[in-house]
Amino acid sequence: RSTFEITSFAQKIQPNNELEPIMRHGEHPRILQFRNTEEEIQSLADLVSSFKSSHYTSLGIICKTESQAKELAQKLQPYTDCISLLSNQSSTYIKGIIITSAHMAKGLEFDEVIIPQADDKNYHSSTDKSMLYVAVTRAMHKLTLTYSSPLRICRFL
């Protein structure tokens, strides 16, 4: 279901012999670095805006934890009102733009995925590596990872 480029990117994080790439090509995954958290949040709002003017119908903003997803949903609120938080308390799944955790995203797929805070402080353990892999493999067509200085990009990328 994911493009060849996204599948290849996922294999670098955590090799999986059962993950067979389909021969559908697309954009290479992007890793965007920002000077600070505020700049990263503004860029996430810009990425959401770009998504809304694209032909894609589903966007997953996948955080490592549910608390990070809730915090990010609040920070993005001033920029857009069309984002839904998918959490343990959610009773329904709403299509469109979803912010959720990697755990809650398991089994879902999105046309486009954004993974914020993809830094070495946030993703450093073997469990984190698995969560990152799950988040990356939710993307079917477009994948963007973001992080802020002074932190470094996560060691698994």
Sequence positions of predicted segments:
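Conserved RecA-like helicase ATPase core segment
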Residues: R1-L32, F156-L157
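Short acidic-hydrophobic, aromatic-tinged amphipathic segments that line or gate anion-handling sites
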Residues: R30-E40
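Core RecA-like ATPase module of SF1/SF2 helicases and allied nucleic-acid translocases
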Residues: R1-F4, N17, E38, Q42, ...
